[in-house]
C-alpha cells in the first residue's frame, strides 16, 4: 500500500520530556535561540575582548606567583600565613 508505514531502523517513538525541574525552567530561555545563526560576526569581537582580558588576568597572577611583580610589604611564604 502507498499509505502504509515502512519499517525503518528508527522506531516511531514520541518524545516524552523528563521531569520538569526548577533549574530546567530557569535555563530554558538560554536555549531558546539554539540553532539560530545570525549572519555576520555577531558577538565574536566581544568574546575576543573578554578572552584578551582573561589572558591579561592570568599573566598578572603568574607574575605575582613567580614574584616577577614586586609588591612592597607582601611576603610570599607559608610562614607568614600562620602568624
UniProtKB/Swiss-Prot annotation:
PTM entry text: Phosphorylation is a light-dependent reaction catalyzed by a membrane-bound kinase; phosphorylation occurs on Thr residue(s) in the N-terminus of the protein.
Modified residues (Phosphothreonine): 3
Disordered: annotated segments: 1-21
Transmembrane segments: 45-65
Gene Ontology biological process terms from the UniProt entry: photosynthesis; protein stabilization
Record flagged with keyword Plastid: yes
This protein's UniProt keywords: Chloroplast, Membrane, Phosphoprotein, Photosynthesis, Photosystem II, Plastid, Thylakoid, Transmembrane, Transmembrane helix
Gene Ontology molecular function: phosphate ion binding
Metal-binding among keywords: no
InterPro entries recorded: PSII_PsbH, PSII_PsbH_sf
Coiled coil: none
Domain of life: Eukaryota
Localization terms from the record: Plastid, Chloroplast thylakoid membrane
Bias (Polar residues): 1-11
Subunit description: PSII is composed of 1 copy each of membrane proteins PsbA, PsbB, PsbC, PsbD, PsbE, PsbF, PsbH, PsbI, PsbJ, PsbK, PsbL, PsbM, PsbT, PsbX, PsbY, PsbZ, Psb30/Ycf12, at least 3 peripheral proteins of the oxygen-evolving complex and a large number of cofactors. It forms dimeric complexes.
Family label: Belongs to the PsbH family.
NCBIfam families: PRK02624.1
Protein name listed in UniProt: Photosystem II reaction center protein H
Source organism of this protein record: Stigeoclonium helveticum
Amino acid at each position: 500500500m502507498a499509505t502504509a508505514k515502512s519499517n525503518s531502523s528508527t522506531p516511531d517513538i514520541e518524545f516524552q520530556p523528563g521531569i520538569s525541574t526548577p533549574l530546567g525552567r530557569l535555563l530554558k530561555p538560554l536555549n531558546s535561540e539554539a540553532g539560530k545563526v545570525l549572519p555576520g560576526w555577531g558577538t565574536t569581537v566581544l568574546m575576543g575582548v573578554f578572552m584578551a582580558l582573561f589572558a591579561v588576568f592570568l599573566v598578572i597572577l603568574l607574575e605575582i606567583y613567580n614574584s616577577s611583580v614586586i609588591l612592597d610589604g607582601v611576603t610570599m611564604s607559608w610562614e607568614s600565613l600562620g602568624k
